[in-house]
């Protein structure tokens, strides 16, 4: 007799409280988490920072380190803790490949675990991975803002326009009001 096992793990009730909405943007400190991989994400966060500030928020940009050893990872963790300790809202991206999606979601969940309203940003191609990673940490209800894939390799002016076109949806995904 042959037994066939499902490769899917058993479902566990890990769901944590829902991600809180932002509410009014005016007066909030919105943290935009960048990495060192995607120039297109720098352009997007530049555009979103301008739009957030026009809506009355203050923006703080933090660049995640590239982990090359224990020292960099420890220092990066300390810097991130300081970053999320000084913001009211976290926007973590960009999930655009396997490892960058892992770290963007890791940092989003870290912010959410402190009670911050949080949005993870992934490209459409990496949505499923991002949601799976968040669910593994008990956040199957993480707010995820989807962006088109691919972004990298497009002309700068096109990427900046995409950012502007997606800003209203970012605000809606945050549960924010302008």
Language-model features and meaning:
Residues 10-17, 71-84:
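Glycine-rich, highly charged phosphate/nucleotide-binding loops
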Residues 52-66, 141-148:
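Short beta-strand elements in bilobed, periplasmic/extracellular small-molecule ligand-binding domains
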Residues 1-26:
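Short N-terminal or domain-adjacent regulatory/targeting segments
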Residues 22-23, 27-59:
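Glycine-rich phosphate/diphosphate-binding loop of Rossmann-like nucleotide-binding domains
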Residues 104-129, 145:
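Short, acidic/small-residue loops that bind anionic groups at enzyme active sites
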Residues 145-178:
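A charged, well-structured terminal subsegment
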Residues 126-138:
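Glycine-rich, charge-decorated loop segments at or immediately adjacent to ligand/cofactor-binding or catalytic sites
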